[in-house]
């Protein structure tokens, strides 16, 4: 793409003068700019609380159609390997915007909505591309929220600004084809063509093959403990564009805005909530998958939930000890001893299900876990409160 200089800023040829990153001052740093103020500068309407919901949805739908129709055709189809360069990331930004918009989602710390970014996109895109290519782009903060976990306690999620989610999604589209072909087939989480259903099907097959004991490994706060240095080294094995590696490093180290407004540094971990996080978690645990394969184990992994199937309790305890040493020594992660166990598959839930062997036939049936049953009943009560009150 030919470029020309304008006030020491890189401007794509034929593009409009780039606007600064929404929510940031020039160079991607400084005080936040209110969304309403940015919209006035751009002379574009945005979604506000005063807009009727129906009108906002129609305008968003129409804007999506306009952007989709005007988007350039990808040089390489999404899902196919392309050079892992910043140019490829910049080229995929509009595709990434459409993906992020389809997922909806809440605003990040800067308060910008997806609807607002859609309206501003023609003016935002040239400047965003220029900042990425020049290495100037600085991600904003990550809004920390906590949601209840099915087993009790809370799970922390990190919600990036909408524009950062677009950049993360474009980066994911470039990186995923480089790793996807070499990920282990027993890894099922957040991968094309795989799901909870394929994971349960493989686990069921292992039990049917006579592996009637389960080594249930619980990685304690996995997403919060990922070592940035080890992850960076893994990425550098397949990505040679230093600008892209630096960008990913900035995403990982983006400051976290806690619910009480306190801002904290982020020196380790991969915050859950961004489009890039699931892929990076699989890159981290791919080494674990191939170590399990090297040792000849039957296993299934879905994100940070791993189950190894063995033929006896004694073998399971031996495997548990060996894998704990590998995880904590090599991967620098931690096994939660209180939640990990060697047990029969019917006594451990996996993705909301249990596997039980029918003694008379030797076949394996898939059952809802007790926790899933309770959650389902609670949901039914919430959806039909009057019915339950009448009883």
Can you say where each PLM-predicted feature lies in the sequence?
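Duplex nucleic acid-engaging cores and interfaces of nucleic-acid transaction enzymes
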Residues: 162-170, 204, 232
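Non-catalytic, polymerase-adjacent accessory regions of viral genome-replication enzymes
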Residues: 1-122
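Short, compositionally biased low-complexity segments
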Residues: 61-73, 88-105, 142-144, 172-178, ...
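Conserved phosphate-binding loops in nucleotide/dinucleotide-binding enzymes
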Residues: 156-161, 366
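Phosphate/adenylate-binding "loop-and-lid" substructures adjacent to NTP/NAD/dNTP-binding pockets
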Residues: 94-97, 106-154
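Conserved polymerase palm-domain catalytic core
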Residues: 124, 131-146, 150, 174, ...
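A conserved non-catalytic segment of reverse transcriptases
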Residues: 253, 330-391
């Amino acid at each position: 793409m030919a470029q020309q200089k304008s006030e020491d800023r890189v401007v794509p040829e034929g593009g409009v003068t780039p606007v600064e990153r929404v929510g940031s001052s020039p160079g991607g740093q400084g005080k936040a700019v209110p969304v309403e103020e940015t919209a006035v500068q751009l002379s574009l309407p945005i979604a506000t609380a005063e807009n009727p919901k129906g009108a906002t949805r129609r305008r968003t739908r129409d804007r999506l159609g306009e952007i989709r129709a005007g988007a350039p055709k990808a040089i390489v189809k999404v899902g196919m390997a392309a050079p892992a360069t910043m140019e490829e990331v910049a080229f995929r930004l509009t595709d990434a915007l459409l993906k992020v918009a389809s997922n909806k989602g809440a605003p990040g710390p800067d308060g910008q909505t997806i609807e607002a970014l859609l309206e501003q996109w023609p003016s935002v895109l040239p400047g965003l591309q220029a900042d990425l290519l020049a290495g100037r782009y600085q991600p904003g903060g990550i809004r920390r929220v906590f949601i209840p976990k099915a087993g009790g306690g809370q799970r922390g999620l990190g919600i990036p600004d909408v524009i950062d989610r677009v950049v993360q999604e474009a980066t994911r589209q470039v990186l995923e084809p480089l790793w996807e072909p070499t990920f282990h087939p027993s890894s099922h989480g957040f991968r094309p063509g795989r799901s909870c259903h394929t994971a349960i099907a493989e686990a069921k097959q292992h039990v049917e093959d006579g592996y009637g004991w389960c080594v249930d490994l619980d990685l304690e706060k996995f997403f919060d403990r990922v070592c940035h240095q080890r992850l960076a080294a893994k990425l550098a094995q397949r990505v040679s564009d230093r600008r892209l590696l630096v960008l990913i490093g900035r995403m990982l180290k983006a400051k976290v805005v806690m619910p009480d407004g306190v801002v904290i540094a982020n020196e380790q971990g991969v915050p859950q909530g961004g489009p890039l996080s699931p892929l990076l978690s699989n890159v981290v645990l791919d080494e674990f998958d191939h170590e399990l394969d090297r040792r000849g184990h039957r296993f299934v992994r879905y994100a940070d939930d791993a189950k190894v199937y063995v033929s006896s309790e004694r073998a399971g305890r031996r495997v548990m000890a060996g894998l704990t040493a590998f995880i904590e020594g090599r991967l620098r992660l931690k096994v939660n001893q209180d939640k990990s166990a060697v047990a029969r598959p019917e006594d451990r839930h996996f993705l909301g299900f249990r596997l039980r062997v029918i003694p008379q036939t030797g076949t394996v049936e898939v059952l809802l876990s007790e926790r899933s049953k309770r959650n389902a009943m609670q949901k039914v009560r919430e959806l039909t409160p009057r019915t339950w009150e009448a009883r």
